[in-house]
Amino acid sequence: MAKSLETTVKIKKMKQLNPYVLVILSFIVVIFIGSFLLCLPFAQTSGKWGNYMDALFHAVSATCVTGLSTYVEGIGNQLTLFGQIVMMAMIQIGGLGFITVLTFFITLIKSKLEFKNRYLISQMVGSTNFADVVKFVRKLILISFIVEIIGTLIGLPVFLTAYPGQPSKAVWNSLFMAISAFNNAGFDLFGATSLVRGVGNAFIDSLPTWAYYYLCTYTMVLIVVGGISFLVIIDVFGFKKHRQWRAFTKIVLVTTAVLLVAGWGIFMLTDGLGGHGMNTFETLFQSVTLRTAGFSTYNQDNISLAGKIFGCFLMFIGGSPLSTAGGVKTTTIFMIFLAMFSYLRGKPVIAFKRTYSSNMIVKAMSLVFLGLFALIAGFIAISLFENKNLDGVVQTDTSTAIVYEVFSAFGTVGVSTGITPSITLGSKIVLCLLMFAGRLGPMTFFSIFQTNMDKKQGIHFEYVEEDFLIG
């Protein structure tokens, strides 16, 4: 009893600390260290100091696992092996979270963490049991390590075919691709045109047909696995007999499946059957990659207007909570649609034999509203910075290209119509802010103020409730 009371007192004291501030600061530290390293002469193939704004942009893009790049020739041609290692490290840290990685290495040295550290880390990684947070963090690291090693081994046949007699280069490219795909980063070492064929990408164009489709297929699998949430992976592959899946797992799997299949079908209508040139495989890849990955098998500038609009919808949704993906998350959209249909039918909000509170609905709607506000602000800012700077850069209408870029940045996707290398300094800063906000989530920033408000103790009272007309 005494121990339980002591634990309760400790938890109340820990709640005075703000884990969200630590999360934000940890990402900022990684970004600035990474940007400095990318600027170094031995990180650039030119052997000269790199442009700091470009280095900062790529540090943000990698740490926020986005994939947008201002390098005209791509990171594979712009960065040396050292620079590529720095990028890969930031992708890995950004996908898992700096606090998660740091906790793992600390526990290798110390067998136990202090109560304060366990509580804070549990809040940051989303663990519901702070007592077992170390075990949970180790599971996250182990899952990532296993998936990335398997992905590297699966990808080796492609790279050994592309680089005969160069096994070390093949292994490095396969490892980088596996880590980038699993963490939904969208970076590769092939050039500036991702996986698009017939546009002058020497690596992609040199691949036999089987190798190309093999590469794209296993990339899609890694993207999906990385975006469905570590909690779902643990739940599905926990190998515990007679244990039912959590409602969270069912919601994530159902929503993910619906979005993938519906996305495939809609892209077939807008860009497959519509005469825009996408084949069946490319429309499937488009449906997968726009959920925060950033790889592409088709020139995004050539996608129809309807395809771009639907693509923005997918980018806004993103992946699932506690995954390597960005966006407002699948569970958020699920909750909003569930609440809407429940309201129309005059029934309580129920799914998978569970009832959901109004607080969850309000939180989901707040997240969507904050996300849309960030997107609108980003679009206005970039439009002001660019003015007529982008005229003639892309075939697409400039405003459409900017909207696509803004959604891509906020959703930490990384696809682009091709305007990224041409944008001005101000626009680069705006995109960096959008990528940062998209990776951490608007609610992370909102929670800082919410936590500070909760700390203020005062006289509690309530106003009289009153309804007014809506709609």
Task: List the predicted regions and their residue ranges.
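Membrane-proximal intracellular helices of multi-pass ion channels
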Residues: M1-G471
